[in-house]
């Protein structure tokens, strides 16, 4: 077994799927760790091509020889809620002004998508997490 490479950095970014380019904020974040920015952009765009239109969080692990690996996550819950509700952004005052509503089925669908990245053991717990996020955005959950 080859010796393990030493990790020198962990970078977390949220980038539009298939739209990574060397401009800020990606360029400076990777540049300070000495990563080949174009190489990352090409690899990320190829990996997320099928999910165009979504924001995809990515975790980039940088090694001391300036090589890197990256893991893509599921889109943020807030983005999925906004897409399902059909709103551009959440409410500025979520407890007084409601901007949209979601059904239980829509919440379950979002929870199923996010289950792998959520700190939840089952789908019911994941649903509660998603419903809480929706509430804090001014989106009501109806039965």
Curated annotation (Swiss-Prot):
One of its GO terms (cellular component) is cytosolic large ribosomal subunit. One or more lysine residues are methylated. It comes from Beutenbergia cavernae (strain ATCC BAA-8 / DSM 12333 / CCUG 43141 / JCM 11478 / NBRC 16432 / NCIMB 13614 / HKI 0122). Coiled coil: none annotated. Belongs to the universal ribosomal protein uL11 family. Keywords: Methylation, Ribonucleoprotein, Ribosomal protein, RNA-binding, rRNA-binding. HAMAP family: Ribosomal_uL11. Forms part of the ribosomal stalk which helps the ribosome interact with GTP-bound translation factors. InterPro entries: Ribosomal_uL11 (IPR000911), Ribosomal_uL11_bac-typ (IPR006519), Ribosomal_uL11_C (IPR020783), Ribosomal_uL11_C_sf (IPR036769), Ribosomal_uL11_CS (IPR020785), Ribosomal_uL11_N (IPR020784), Ribosomal_uL11_N_sf (IPR036796). One of its GO terms (biological process) is translation. Part of the ribosomal stalk of the 50S ribosomal subunit. Interacts with L10 and the large rRNA to form the base of the stalk. L10 forms an elongated spine to which L12 dimers bind in a sequential fashion forming a multimeric L10(L12)X complex. The keyword rRNA-binding applies. This is Large ribosomal subunit protein uL11. One of its GO terms (molecular function) is large ribosomal subunit rRNA binding.
């Amino acid at each position: 077994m080859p010796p393990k490479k030493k990790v020198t950095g962990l970078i977390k970014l949220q980038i539009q799927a298939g739209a990574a380019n060397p401009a800020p904020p990606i360029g400076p974040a990777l540049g300070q760790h000495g990563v080949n920015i174009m190489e990352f952009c090409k690899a990320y765009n190829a990996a997320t091509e099928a999910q165009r239109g979504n924001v995809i969080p990515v975790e980039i692990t940088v090694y001391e020889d300036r090589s890197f690996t990256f893991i893509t996550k599921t889109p943020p819950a807030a983005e999925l809620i906004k897409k399902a509700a059909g709103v551009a952004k959440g409410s500025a005052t979520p407890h007084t002004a409601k901007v949209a509503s979601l059904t239980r089925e829509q919440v379950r669908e979002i929870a199923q998508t996010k289950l792998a990245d959520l700190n939840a053991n089952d789908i019911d717990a994941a649903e509660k997490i998603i419903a809480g996020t929706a509430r804090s955005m001014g989106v009501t959950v109806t039965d």
